[in-house]
Amino acid sequence: MSASWADVADSEKAVSQSKPPYVPPHLRNRPSEPVAAPLPQNDHAGYGGQPAGSRWAPPSSGGGGASGGGYRNDGGRTGYGYGAGGGGGGGGGWNNRSGGWDRREREVNPFGDDAELEPVFTEQENTGINFDAYEDIPVETSGGDVPPPVNTFADIDLGDALNLNIRRCKYVRPTPVQRHAIPILLAERDLMACAQTGSGKTAAFCFPIISGIMKDQHVERPRGSRAVYPFAVILSPTRELACQIHDEAKKFSYQTGVKVVVAYGGTPIHQQLRELERGCDILVATPGRLNDLLERARVSMQMIRFLALDEADRMLDMGFEPQIRKIVEQMDMPPRGVRQTMLFSATFPSQIQRLAADFMSNYIFLAVGRVGSSTDLITQRVEFVQESDKRSHLMDLLHAQRETQDKQSLTLVFVETKRGADTLENWLCMNEFPATSIHGDRTQQEREVALRSFKTGRTPILVATDVAARGLDIPHVAHVVNFDLPNDIDDYVHRIGRTGRAGKSGIATAFFNENNAQLARSLAELMQEANQEVPEWLTRYASRASFGGGKKRSGGRFGGRDFRREGSYSRGGGGGGGGGGSDYYGGGGYGGGGYGGAPSGGYGAGVTSAWD
């Protein structure tokens, strides 16, 4: 009699119950592990999350969150997550002030692990000035109720986390610009600061900004918008300087809960948008890219409390005035007097001060003498070289430098044109001098590769246009060569400021010929002021320039003086209607509606405002 299908099924079930479960070969002979209890589930939390209403999930549960959460919820929108809620807890998500993950726990350490933290922080110790030799560096301040300077960082209430980072940086004491600028900014005053290159200007404005944001981190941002709402924006004229400020600000803000993001042109915008979506308290940007983000409605200026312009005179002088004015006055940025504005640069000519004053309210002008950048630290040489002899003269300098300086020493060569930079780079490489170049026509990736190659010493000669002259902190630059002198003495000051940094000595060599005659007077004055030896032939050129109306350098030992203290700036009403007194341009004193009585605040008869 044949067995039924039910009997066959029962017999197979009995056999299967008598067989041990199959174990793969690589797992055999191992002790069995206890089975983990199932994770709690509920209708309101994500996978493994806490019940709704709890702000934090325990570390062992793997996160999750209640409804309203998400990967990031700056504006109340739902992001990524499992279950009915999302990635964040409570009403939050990543970077939400009222809930979600603590960004400090998830922050990537920019310095590696703790063992590597200390050496990285000690790379730059009080860059720019030999403090023991320059205790008497001249400082001028003007404006009402100027806060007194401080002598140590311990005298300043910046917050525990920021003070810890300052100690990690081995910043023993504030630089002259920091001693005066930080108390002014902590007092919530607007500031226009003029200080030498390499004097610590970046830290001077970053410390108060980070400290101010740390103290008010409970402030809620608007909800229901795709835009991010930073509390501070720092504008820079070049991509390289923006990246440098970003790196420094990230170091200062480490473990403070303050998120710093950089945005600049020349690269695809998508990666920068992703960084912004992860949260942004401080936005470092170039004017063009920031305008792009504002027009896309991906960034809002509505919550801005701090506006900083680094190398402000360069931005205004390079033609960024319309873009900056649009950002500051035509978007939703709070007006001056509500936000705090700070402008920093190594030079502030009076014309630029007049423009910058439109952004500020009852500001303090701070001028720190540039003694440390031009006396003992930098030896300035001016050599008469005809155009046709410049290459051979440069080769002689480089050969002599090879014999006298160590392998770490770098040489920065400035030229006037982009084509000249490429041509000189190729010529140096053909003559067995490893060189690279940066200028405005190179892509951002090419510029970053060139700078990295130069900083590491793989190509110890960098040929550059003025794009590299402003603000960049490149260590070990022993020699700056002005292959082509600039047309303006302020650009010369910025160029030679690339050497003599971090308390190290440097050499600045300039090739001068008849084409540079208009610079002779100001160049001779600068060298005399710095106790440098002025060649007799340069003195003769300078005297000719004096008779011919050559340009006189303003500001003396400083990069500029407060134009409000000049005789041309008088707040009387007698110049109204363009008829009173005589201003800087000879077009009428300041009275009535503006400079020279112009009803719209112009600069007097015959002078076109840069804002027009």
From Swiss-Prot:
Catalytic activity as recorded in UniProt: ATP + H2O = ADP + phosphate + H(+)
Domain named Helicase C-terminal: residues: 377-542
Any one Gene Ontology cellular component term annotated for this protein: nucleolus
Motif (Q motif): 151-179
Sequence motif DEAD box, location on chain: 310-313
One Gene Ontology term of the molecular function aspect: ATP binding
Keyword set includes Nucleotide-binding: yes
N-acetylserine modification, residue list: 2
Entry binding sites for ATP: 195-202
Region of interest (Disordered), ranges: 1-70, 83-104, 547-583
InterPro entries: DEAD/DEAH_box_helicase_dom, Ded1/Dbp1_DEADc, Helicase_ATP-bd, Helicase_C-like, P-loop_NTPase, RNA_helicase_DEAD_Q_motif
EC number: 3.6.4.13
Residue span(s) of domain Helicase ATP-binding: 182-366
Disulfide bond positions: none
Biased segments, Basic and acidic residues type: 559-568
Pfam families, per database record: DEAD, Helicase_C
Keywords assigned by UniProt, alphabetized: Acetylation, ATP-binding, Helicase, Hydrolase, Nucleotide-binding, RNA-binding
Biased composition (Gly residues): 61-70, 83-94, 570-583
Enzyme kind, highest EC tier: hydrolase
Domain of life: Eukaryota
Family: Belongs to the DEAD box helicase family. DDX3/DED1 subfamily.
Comment block on domains: The Q motif is unique to and characteristic of the DEAD box family of RNA helicases and controls ATP binding and hydrolysis.
Protein name: DEAD-box ATP-dependent RNA helicase 11
Gene: RH11
